[in-house]
């Protein structure tokens, strides 16, 4: 498995595809670059999803998130991109991606992107 930042999200078969369950992850070291100022933006990315047939492999997720480190992107765009890329890789029953960005200019920004319907009881 690679050790450099990569947009290649690896997956593995859901070990319990017949049972709806939630997977939650928190990635507190996310960074990207503000496209307006060129300054770094720091965020905690929170993922919650109910898998269907595939689950995301954690090291590939870490390397995927690292791949944004030098990319100029708006908070709204990168949060939605992460959600879209995870949907493409996993085809989950439901997913929520929250980008909780550090204060910049006195403003704290939280962006939430969702896909699918959350199964009842999960």
Swiss-Prot record:
It catalyses: 7-aminomethyl-7-carbaguanine + 2 NADP(+) = 7-cyano-7-deazaguanine + 2 NADPH + 3 H(+). It is an enzyme of class 1 (oxidoreductase). Pathway: tRNA modification; tRNA-queuosine biosynthesis. The keyword Transport does not apply. GO terms for biological process: queuosine biosynthetic process; tRNA modification. Keywords: Cytoplasm, NADP, Oxidoreductase, Queuosine biosynthesis. It is found in: Cytoplasm. Disulfide bonds: none annotated. The active site is at residues 34, 41. Substrate binds at residues 56-58, 75-76. One of its GO terms (molecular function) is preQ1 synthase activity. It holds the Pfam family QueF. GO terms for cellular component: cytoplasm. Its EC number is 1.7.1.13. Belongs to the GTP cyclohydrolase I family. QueF type 1 subfamily. Catalyzes the NADPH-dependent reduction of 7-cyano-7-deazaguanine (preQ0) to 7-aminomethyl-7-deazaguanine (preQ1). PANTHER family: NADPH-DEPENDENT 7-CYANO-7-DEAZAGUANINE REDUCTASE (PTHR34354:SF1). This is NADPH-dependent 7-cyano-7-deazaguanine reductase.
């Amino acid at each position: 498995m690679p050790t450099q930042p990569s947009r290649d999200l690896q997956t593995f078969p859901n070990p319990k595809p017949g049972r709806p369950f939630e997977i939650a992850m928190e990635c507190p070291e996310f960074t990207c670059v503000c496209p307006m100022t060129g300054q770094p933006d720091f965020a905690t990315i929170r993922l919650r999803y109910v898998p269907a047939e595939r689950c995301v492999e954690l090291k590939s997720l870490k390397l995927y998130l690292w791949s944004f480190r030098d990319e100029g992107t708006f908070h709204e765009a990168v949060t939605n991109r992460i959600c879209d890329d995870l949907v493409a890789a996993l085809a989950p029953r439901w997913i929520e991606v929250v980008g909780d960005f550090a204060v910049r200019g006195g403003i704290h920004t939280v962006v939430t992107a969702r896909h699918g319907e959350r199964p009842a009881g999960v």
